């Protein structure tokens, strides 16, 4: 048998060079077309469109398109053109980048480093004479000793990877078990020791005492309360925190014995998740009007408020359950720290402390924005908060310590402002920090980094992008709702991934900002509030008293500012959608798709809840365009009798029952957005048992298993999407069980992956594992924090000075 040959993997530069040799004329023609467009940035579709139009015969076209250079173009995320050069940013797979530059006149090819590529890109703004002494940010050296996976499929599973690494290190070197002993010995609550006392000073002693304790407890009934053998364990070196019954104490001691003998990832994660570490949690969300009533729809106030209120209710329930099982008599505390707004617009945002309904130990703590002129009384945009955050962090820290009678155990930041304040607090207090971005603005505004000066007067992105970099690198762990939020898809760049390398010309150049392979990334998806969103089949819980108002909303013949259009055949199922009325959410696209699909119009009625109906009531330019488009569609396609348009609804309880009412009609939910970061309405609808059709662009593609628990639709191919919907309803007409089959599969998917219970369990476990990792990797973290501290003081604070303070008058 012949020996297999080793072949060299060609670099991007080599592949371009080879294509130049094989298809010189075609490639020169193509690259010349790029150069002829002049200086600028070309997007992926521009690159492919030119490829399609430049080539002559089909054979040559196929050879070039399917060859090495064609593959490079298909994986290029952008091209920078500065004649006679064309530079490509090539992304072979999520998280992996290469850069190459071609001189079209000389036909020379060179591989570029990240720094060289960004410097070339800066020529779009600064010309060829940019400052050679530009500040470059590079966090890679600080993470050299941090283990990380190499496969793109491992991104977002950081805790699993970290557990494998930690258990492997412990298995290979028993000396590495010492930090675990130290970690257990430092646990105290208000000065009282938990887990271990001074009688256990070494690993060998711990193993001996564990064996004695297990022997003692195994003779007891599993239900024996901890108090009945507490003093016996204390004499052996064990304090409270192991469990409330003999059975739970024994389970936890077995886990620790197994770890000391032969560490494995699942045992380590389970054990660290059971260690009592988190009693006081602080959640930061400074901007907007944060309240429990009359706030949704106010500026900068929406999904983040709903997310946090649902989050804390689930988190408190999980904390109480864990504390009880740990055998502790401790009341947890959760503080949502937000801004106090004296001019509160009829909300409770001027109250310092407010208990969260449905909880016993969770409060909203409001702290005002303060400057040298005094307290700021009015709301300000989230883009203008930067001058206030440093003082706010100090003031809020004092208020928090006063409320908790000590420092918190765990801090969670939300959005750019909350994450920066969380970073300042966590750095000062030395506690575990979790970051939740919700949205990273850099990805929402194309080219807002390279052309930051064009945006800065209005949005102050130089401050925001800098704050985001500081927070994501300071955080002990980051949670996202989807994989795509971290690393995108094969054809799109992830929100965090876009912060790996970018430049703000004249300010600084980021050559290694964040690594999406970092094990700090974890996907922890939220759910729907199951007190509001529950299956249509749970008849005893149904809010039947609301059915009258729901029927009025759906079927009333009156045409008002609240609803237009009528449904003449009430026996038809309802295809339902609910979203903001803007271009991205694409509600008008759904209406147009329905309008043009005769078969779908025969099978179902369409109901949408979106925005304003009266154009005079809207101040949003994008919404105004969509309102006019909706009215034109109704008129041009004669939709009256089959279509109902209802204005935006903020009553969540009624919205929950509305989903179930739609399910009673054997209807379905549609989410037609061009892009949806997560898709909370998709989760809400599926939780109520509604079969769901949702965009394949973004989070819903991960929520729904196509053809099983719902259906993916592509809003860029509306005819195909309409046919998928029509086929479903036609099949349901022939086989009524098909509707229930999809409904049940959707519910099963939710219960397995998308509930607040799963979320809170996971979050608490992550707090334990990363708390331990923070403890055992102090030195590496200290180096990173010093670098961040310097960047904050020398760069961020100067940028903040460029943001004008807001006046109350």
Curated annotation (Swiss-Prot):
SUPFAM superfamilies: UDP-Glycosyltransferase/glycogen phosphorylase
EC number: 2.4.1.13
Segments crossing the lipid bilayer: none
GO biological process: response to mannitol; response to water deprivation; seed maturation; starch metabolic process; sucrose metabolic process
Entry keyword set: Glycosyltransferase, Stress response, Transferase
Induction of its expression: By drought stress. By mannitol, an osmotic agent. Positively regulated by LEC2.
Family according to the record: Belongs to the glycosyltransferase 1 family. Plant sucrose synthase subfamily.
Annotated protein name in UniProt: Sucrose synthase 3
Source species of the chain: Arabidopsis thaliana
Organism lineage: Eukaryota, Viridiplantae, Streptophyta, Embryophyta, Tracheophyta
Gene: SUS3
């Amino acid at each position: 048998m012949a020996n297999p040959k080793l072949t060299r993997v060609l670099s991007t530069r080599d592949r371009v060079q080879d294509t130049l040799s094989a298809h010189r004329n075609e490639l020169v023609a193509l690259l010349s077309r790029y150069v002829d467009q002049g200086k600028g940035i070309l997007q992926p579709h521009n690159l492919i469109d030119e490829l399609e139009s430049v080539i002559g015969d089909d054979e040559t076209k196929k050879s070039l398109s399917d060859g090495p250079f064609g593959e490079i173009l298909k994986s290029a995320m952008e091209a920078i053109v500065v004649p006679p050069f064309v530079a490509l940013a090539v992304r072979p797979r999520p998280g992996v980048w290469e850069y190459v530059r071609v001189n079209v006149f000389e036909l020379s090819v060179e591989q570029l480093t990240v720094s060289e590529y960004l410097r070339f890109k800066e020529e779009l703004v600064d010309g060829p004479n940019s400052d050679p002494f530009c500040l470059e940010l590079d966090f890679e050296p600080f993470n050299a000793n941090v283990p990380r996976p190499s496969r793109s499929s491992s991104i977002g599973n950081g805790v699993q990877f970290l557990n494998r690494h930690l258990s492997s290190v412990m298995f290979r070197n028993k000396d590495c078990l010492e930090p675990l002993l130290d970690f257990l010995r430092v646990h105290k609550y208000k000065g009282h020791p938990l887990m271990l006392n001074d009688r256990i000073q070494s690993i060998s002693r711990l193993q001996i005492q564990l064996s004695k304790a297990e022997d003692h407890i195994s003779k007891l009934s599993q239900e024996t309360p901890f108090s009945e053998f507490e003093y016996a364990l204390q004499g052996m070196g064990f304090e409270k925190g192991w469990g409330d019954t003999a059975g739970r104490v024994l389970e936890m001691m077995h886990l620790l014995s197994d770890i000391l003998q032969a560490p494995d990832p699942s045992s380590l994660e389970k054990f660290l998740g059971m260690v009592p570490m988190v009693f006081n949690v602080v959640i930061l969300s400074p901007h907007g009007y944060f309240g429990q009533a009359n706030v949704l729809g106010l500026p900068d106030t929406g999904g983040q408020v709903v997310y946090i209120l649902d989050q804390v209710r689930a988190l408190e329930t999980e904390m109480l359950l864990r504390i009880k099982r740990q055998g502790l008599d401790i009341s947890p505390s959760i503080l949502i720290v937000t801004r106090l707004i004296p001019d509160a617009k009829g909300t409770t945002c001027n109250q310092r402390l407010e208990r969260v309904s449905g909880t016993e130990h969770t409060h909203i703590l409001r702290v005002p924005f303060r400057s040298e002129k005094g307290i700021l009384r009015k709301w300000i945009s989230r883009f203008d908060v930067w001058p206030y955050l440093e003082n706010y962090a100090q003031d809020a820290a004092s208020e928090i310590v006063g409320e908790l009678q000590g420092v918190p155990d765990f801090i969670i930041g939300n959005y750019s402002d909350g994450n920066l304040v969380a970073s300042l607090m966590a750095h000062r207090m030395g506690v575990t920090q979790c970051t939740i971005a919700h949205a990273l603005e850099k990805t929402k505004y194309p080219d807002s980094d390279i052309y930051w000066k064009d945006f800065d007067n209005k949005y102050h992105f130089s401050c925001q992008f800098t704050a985001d970099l500081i927070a994501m690198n300071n955080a002990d762990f980051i949670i996202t709702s989807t994989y795509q939020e971290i690393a995108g898809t094969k054809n799109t760049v992830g929100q965090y991934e876009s912060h790996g390398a970018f430049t703000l010309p004249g300010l600084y150049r980021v050559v290694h900002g964040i690594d999406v392979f970092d094990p700090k990334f974890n996907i922890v998806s939220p759910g729907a509030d199951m007190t509001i969103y529950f299956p249509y089949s749970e008849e005893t819980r149904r809010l039947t008293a609301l059915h009258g108002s729901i029927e009025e909303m759906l079927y009333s013949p009156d045409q008002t500012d609240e609803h237009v259009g009528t449904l003449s055949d009430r026996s038809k199922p309802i295809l339902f959608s609910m979203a903001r009325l803007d271009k991205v959410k694409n509600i008008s696209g759904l209406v147009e798709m329905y309008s043009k699909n005769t078969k779908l119009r025969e099978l179902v009625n369409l109901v949408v809840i979106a925005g304003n109906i009266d154009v005079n009531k809207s101040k949003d330019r994008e919404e105004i365009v969509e309102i006019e488009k909706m009215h034109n569609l109704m008129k041009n396609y004669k939709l009256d009798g089959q279509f109902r348009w209802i204005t935006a609804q903020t009553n969540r309880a009624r919205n929950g029952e509305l989903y179930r009412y739609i399910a009673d009609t054997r209807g379905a939910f549609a989410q037609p957005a061009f892009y949806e970061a997560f898709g909370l309405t998709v989760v809400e609808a599926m939780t109520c048992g509604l079969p769901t059709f949702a965009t394949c662009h973004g989070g819903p593609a991960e929520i729904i298993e196509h053809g099983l628990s719902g259906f993916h639709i592509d809003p860029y191919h509306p005819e195909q999407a309409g046919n998928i919907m029509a086929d479903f309803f036609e099949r349901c007409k022939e086989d009524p069980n098909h509707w229930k089959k999809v409904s049940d599969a959707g519910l099963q998917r939710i219960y397995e992956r998308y509930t607040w219970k799963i979320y809170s369990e996971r979050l608490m476990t992550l707090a334990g594992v990363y708390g331990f990792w923070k403890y055992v990797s102090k030195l590496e973290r200290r180096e990173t924090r010093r670098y961040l501290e310097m960047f904050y003081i020398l760069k961020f604070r100067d940028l903040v000075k460029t943001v004008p303070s807001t006046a109350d008058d």
